[in-house]
Amino acid sequence: MGVSDWGVDPTWTLFLDRDGVINRRIFGGYVLDWESFHFLPGVLAGLTFAASRVGRIVVVTNQQCVALGKISEQGLQAIHENMVQEMQQAGGRIDAVFAAIELKTDPQSRRKPKTNMALEAQQRFPEIDFKKSIMVGDTDTDIQFGQALEMKTVLIESEEQVTVIPDIRCKALSDFLYQL
């Protein structure tokens, strides 16, 4: 069963992880300023294409670098504002960015695979139906996040060791987006 069988239309929502999906991931480190943020090849054009195919595009990202004191919340927000602005300038859109800034060890964390960020997105955009949503990520926690809410899941292959089985695998976000 391929993406064309999912029946994706403008009532669907696209949930995206950030690092390793939208931008180059820094293994063993963090994107701490706009100068370190680099869109992966094809992402701007691919998301511009996807913007006409789905109703909402939402970024959900774990960013414990804030709790670790490596970047301020304002610094992280500035990176996200620049990301959204570049996307708009390219003709696409990102409707919202939700970032879990807590430590992995924090029991109150909203980090994926917990579904808090998706529920927050649904509160902001009540039309979101998780059974008509797709989660695209590059880690087990991304796929588990989507599966917990019965979303379709897409794994972007990376250096990350993944044990969870997604609905489909792709080499890059743009490879997936043009299947919508």
What are these regions (language model features)?
Residues 19-41, 66-75, 89, 102-108:
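Metal-dependent phosphoesterase signature
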Residues 21, 61, 153:
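Ser/Thr-centric signal marking residues that sit
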